[in-house]
Curated annotation (Swiss-Prot):
GO molecular function, one term: zinc ion binding
The protein's name in its UniProt record: Putative zinc finger protein ORF110
Keyword set includes Zinc: yes
Keyword terms of this UniProt record: Metal-binding, Zinc, Zinc-finger
Positions annotated as zinc finger (C2H2-type): 3-26
PROSITE patterns (alphabetical): ZINC_FINGER_C2H2_1 (PS00028)
Species, as recorded: Acidianus filamentous virus 1 (isolate United States/Yellowstone)
Amino acid sequence: MTYVCTACKLKFHTFEEFKIHVHLFHPELDKLVEPFPDRKEYRLSIRLDKQTYNMLLNIKNNIQRDNDIGLNTTIKALIYIVNYLLSKGYTIDELTNLPNKVSVIVGGDK
């Protein structure tokens, strides 16, 4: 079983190793990573209000359409979205506790 960091393509044998990697190298995503035990994957979970979600979905779709490289672009777009929200003053705690949860599985081997 391996866990792949979609942001930088590194592979890890355990979820704990993966989580440490995210904590050290992608700290802005640290609290967004959750284990997904039944499928041994990891999940990026962000809770957004509907208006913000729709705005960010449009950004993601535009980025994905422009680059047309599938999942990796989607992940880059989500990381961009998280960084954008952080730059606008949201905290990670706020992003993970807003009412509407948007969960996207961003990697991991089956």
